Amino acid sequence: MAKKKIAISCGDIQGVGLELILKSHKEVSAFCEPLYLIDGELLERANQLLHNAYETKTLNTLAIHSPLPLLNSSTIGKVSAQSGAYSFESFKKACELADDKEVDGVCTLPINKLAWQQAQIPFVGHTDFLKQRYKDHQIIMMLGCSKLFVGLFSDHVPLGAVSQLIQVKELVKFLLAFQKSTQAKIVQVCGFNPHAGEEGLFGEEDEKILKAIQKSNQTLGFECFLGPLPADSAFAPNKRKITPFYVSMSHDVGLAPLKALYFDESINVSLNAPILRASTDHGTAFDIAYQNKANNKSYLNAIKYLA
């Protein structure tokens, strides 16, 4: 069977993305046919910063129609509008190739959200762009590994705004889409307030979550969704034995325990998108850029998921 062709967007070149590309190419090529969406000149510069430790001539690259950002010892680890613009164009090209069926999937390396903002890109990040590009799809951010998956009802949203987003109709739509995409038999849903609201004592959000769970289970015809569970104990070992699938109302409630337990191996997946997209679960790691310290386990797992 022919290997799948995977478009790999470069991420922010001032971070660990190019190190991951170079150090992992041999392993990645065992699983798929990688197409790196980056100008070869930038990979050469990256390799020089890494003391020419890697082979670059065998990598299949595709030039990006965007001005080349500076990449040298004085720019690495720093936010740059030019690097932000370049990483966005690399990602957008990957999506275009996937839309045109020229590649089988998209793997995205970490971007810097402030760099995107400085480049006046009107999206918070990868998932926000996908939600705008594919408006007819209920795209869900899910992170995890085989031991634990967490779907986020809200992702890159200020915590103070999450409460207003918790509405029964929207949550039912989300829960059903999550179950359809994952085919999970049991999903544990984290509550929003302390003690999952203590039966309405601490706000009304958890009552809405309960109603959404009941309506979703009724639609499915079986008790798929459990909760709302008090979030402070939802990820205890005895709870994780029930199912690896969780839903969190907010970003950090779900991802803090996931990353405490399985940070190195977890990946980020865009559920319900018309294209296959996966990513590392970590950021640009500017503090260790070009020091040959980047852990590539999450990146390799993202590739394996797509392949």
Curated annotation (Swiss-Prot):
Highest taxon above the source species: Bacteria
Sites where the protein binds substrate: 126-127, 259, 268, 277
Any Pfam family matching the protein: PdxA
Keywords of this entry: Cobalt, Cytoplasm, Magnesium, Metal-binding, NAD, NADP, Oxidoreductase, Pyridoxine biosynthesis, Zinc
Main subcellular location: cytoplasm
Reactions accelerated catalytically: 4-(phosphooxy)-L-threonine + NAD(+) = 3-amino-2-oxopropyl phosphate + CO2 + NADH
GO molecular function terms noted in the UniProt entry: 4-hydroxythreonine-4-phosphate dehydrogenase activity; cobalt ion binding; magnesium ion binding; NAD binding; zinc ion binding
Subunit structure, as described in the record: Homodimer.
NCBIfam families recorded: pdxA, PRK03946.1
UniProt similarity note: Belongs to the PdxA family.
Protein name: 4-hydroxythreonine-4-phosphate dehydrogenase
